[in-house]
Amino acid sequence: MDAQKKFDLLSMGEILLRLSPLPNEKLARGELLEKRIGGAELNVAAGVAMLGLHTGFISKIPDNKIGDFANNTLHYYGISGDYLLRDTNKDARLGIYYYEGSAAPGKPAVVYDRRHSSALSLTSDELPDEIYRSTRAFHTTGITLALGGAIRETAVDAIRRFKEAGALVSFDVNFRANLWSEEEARESVNRILPYVDVFFCSETTARLTFGKKGDLRDMMKSFTEDYPISVVASTERIVHSPKCHTFGSVIYDAKQDAFYEEEPYRNIEIVDRIGSGDAYIAGVLYGLLGHNGDCRKALAYGNAYSAMKNTVPGDLPFCTRKEIDRIIARHHDGDGAEMDR
């Protein structure tokens, strides 16, 4: 890590409380709910921390026991809460989402209850000026922009100020139709693309939200022609059933004018797919930050981390760098041993 920087990565967004019925149970029928902490941007910070880099999270949480639960999760993963603000308002709350898993032919379902959460009131005035000089990289997503209100403008301002301070800026479009329209997403994301260095965008989003034409590689490269983006990453997931997926990705390095791709991870046994896209981003950012911008490393860590996240419950990844290195080696060498021993 740069000796002058306190963090390798700072991430900004809303922390969510996830409530889920027991496996194979329905929200409309089950009486018990399991609670976990998650959120797209937090998932990335946790993943990068698990791989050995120093991360921190920027948000606002209620000053109550639910906020304590969120804060304790950060501590467990080794994520700094230096910029995790506490909301003392009597109406302070953590956003909630309910997740119902499913087996074929059904599909998983999500219900959100996140309006008026504490995170949405976060303003730039609440953040110290030194924060922008404290990190090598900054990450946020289109979800944070989609939430609107104060946090949207705070995120836009943060992207600009982190970029001006010399940080690598990472942005994941992560389009959610239940949060905003494609037109609103396009207008908001276009505001920040001049400041983005590492851009994550799916093929579907590139076509429908940004109106891109041609094949995937043409669309990825066009983002770097329209804006000073250095790296574009796009994932591909084939859903064979709710319990069996294939996952791979493509990364474009504009400086080298080169695309990177590898054999996808096939027939992944799905325990919980939530957060697997964020784990991919964590792996890519670790590869770039930990290996001097090496896109081959970024691809390998991104694909492996995402594949493994699918195999553990909850939003947050839980794989060490040693485990991921072993998975990568097996994937590349074709080691089919049944058990480590």
Task: Label the model's feature ranges.
Residues 54-142, 324-341:
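Conserved N-terminal subdomain of the carbohydrate kinase-like
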Residues 137, 143-245:
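Conserved beta-alpha-beta core of the PfkB/ribokinase-like small-molecule kinase fold
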Residues 40-50, 155-161:
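Histidine-anchored nucleotide/phosphate-binding helix
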Residues 1-26:
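Positively charged, low-complexity intrinsically disordered leader regions
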Residues 25-44:
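Short catalytic helix/loop segments, enriched in acidic residues and glycine
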Residues 2-8, 160, 213-341:
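Conserved phosphate-binding/catalytic region of the ribokinase-like
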